[in-house]
């Protein structure tokens, strides 16, 4: 894996040597993983594939990190995660933090014509510990219902920003949200 150091510094001016070493480790681990080997053998893989669909009157847009549709209509979606897992398992993290994303990705693939889809999370911290959630066109109604339920509080105006450590670096702090001034 090679990179243009000048371009790297331009894109990531605050990256430390530790950041660079972590990224290099993750890329190297991914390149040697079973999933990467599988993907290398597929024809017609698309990266950063945009999608858009509506649930009721709400437009949902996103991008698949990696998408492949087989001749049989089955789809593979791979989402790369750079989370530091620590003691957590990838499965625990997907259950706790990515349930809405799973449903949205599955809906996007199925509404886009796939007959079935494997939503696959590749945690680059442990690239061979993938998490796969599988769906078929028979799951469309339950997936839509789940996305509707997720959107309901937002559509009803019942949501607050969640302050976190990223707020300290936000250029829009106190302009778009109250950030750390909100009660926890």
Where would I find each of the regions flagged by the language model?
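Surface-exposed helix-capping loop/turn segments at secondary-structure junctions
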Residues: 1-4, 14-15, 37-38, 111-117, ...
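A non-catalytic, helix-rich entry segment at domain boundaries
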Residues: 1-50, 54
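Generic, well-ordered alpha-helical scaffold segments in large soluble proteins
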Residues: 11, 26-33, 108, 112, ...
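Short beta-strand or tight-loop elements
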Residues: 43-49, 60-64, 163
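Mg2+/Mn2+-dependent nuclease catalytic core
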Residues: 56-145
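Polybasic (Lys/Arg-rich)
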Residues: 124, 137-172
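Cys/His-rich metal-chelating microdomains
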Residues: 173-176, 180
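Acidic, low-complexity intrinsically disordered tails
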Residues: 183-184
